[in-house]
Amino acid sequence: MAFKRKFTPKRKFCRFCADKNLPLDYKRPDILKDFVTERGKIIARRITGTCAKHQRRLTTEIKRSRQMALMHYTTVHSTDVKKKSI
């Protein structure tokens, strides 16, 4: 007897391939934060659904945005620092 799936998983797709007008740029942290966990780790492409080409570029742009101080390295740490200084 073969195992039959109860449901078919939803097909993941690359947001950047689907929408050519969506800019992948370090100056847009509002888009980049969707691909970073609350701990500051970059989410794997098997979870986000991005293609290999855009995942590489996404990683580069997130790191560049962090260097330019447009994004935090970790969001949890940044809120703890604010609480201690008050």
Curated annotation (Swiss-Prot):
Q: Which Pfam families match?
A: Ribosomal_S18
Per its UniProt record, what Gene3D superfamilies does this chain match? Ribosomal protein S18
Q: Name one GO biological process term.
A: translation
Q: Which UniProt keywords are given for this protein, alphabetically ordered?
A: Ribonucleoprotein, Ribosomal protein, RNA-binding, rRNA-binding
Keyword match Transcription regulation:
no
Q: Keyword Cell division, does the record have it?
A: no
Any one Gene Ontology molecular-function term assigned to this protein's record? small ribosomal subunit rRNA binding
Q: List the disulfide bonds.
A: none
Gene Ontology CC annotation, any one: cytosolic small ribosomal subunit
Its function?
A: Binds as a heterodimer with protein bS6 to the central domain of the 16S rRNA, where it helps stabilize the platform of the 30S subunit.
Summary of subunit composition and partner proteins: Part of the 30S ribosomal subunit. Forms a tight heterodimer with protein bS6.
User: Would you identify the family this protein belongs to, as annotated?
Assistant: Belongs to the bacterial ribosomal protein bS18 family.
For this entry, the protein name equals Small ribosomal subunit protein bS18
Q: Which gene encodes it?
A: rpsR
